[in-house]
């Protein structure tokens, strides 16, 4: 799992 990309996706979804 790419946590940096996942984190960015979560932030963009907020």
Swiss-Prot record:
Q: Which UniProt keywords apply?
A: Amidation, Antibiotic, Antimicrobial, Chemotaxis, Fungicide, G-protein coupled receptor impairing toxin, Immunity, Innate immunity, Mast cell degranulation, Membrane, Myotoxin, Secreted, Target cell membrane, Target membrane, Toxin
Please tell me how industry or biotechnology makes use of this protein: Could be used to treat biofilm-resistant agents such as A.baumannii and Staphylococcus spp. coated on the surfaces of implanted medical devices, such as vascular stents.
GO molecular function per UniProt: toxin activity
What's the short name of a Pfam family annotated to this entry? Answer: Mastoparan_2
Q: Which residues cross the membrane?
A: none
Q: Which InterPro entries match?
A: Mastoparan_peptide
Q: May I have one GO cellular component term?
A: extracellular region
| Biological process according to GO | chemotaxis; defense response to bacterium; defense response to fungus; innate immune response; killing of cells of another organism; venom-mediated mast cell degranulation in another organism
Location of the protein in the cell: Secreted; Target cell membrane
Q: Which residues carry this modification: Leucine amide?
A: 14
Instruction: Give a brief account of the tissues where this protein occurs.
Output: Expressed by the venom gland.
**Task of the protein:** Antimicrobial and mast cell degranulating peptide with chemotactic activity for leukocytes. Is active against both Gram-negative and -positive bacteria (Staphylococcus aureus (MIC=2 uM), Mycobacterium abscessus subsp. massiliense, S.aureus (EC(50)=1.83 uM), Escherichia coli (MIC=5 uM), Pseudomonas aeruginosa (MIC=38 uM), Bacillus cereus (MIC=5 uM), and the multidrug-resistant bacterium A.baumannii), and fungi (Candida albicans (EC(50)=12.9 uM, EC(90)=15.3 uM) and Cryptococcus neoformans (EC(50)=11 uM, EC(90)=22.7 uM)). Inhibits biofilm formation of A.baumannii and Staphylococcus spp.
Further comment found in the protein's record? The primary structure of this mature peptide is identical to that of Polybia-MPII from Pseudopolybia vespiceps testacea (AC P0DQT3).
**What name is this protein filed under?**
Polybia-MP-II
Q: Give the source species.
A: Polybia paulista
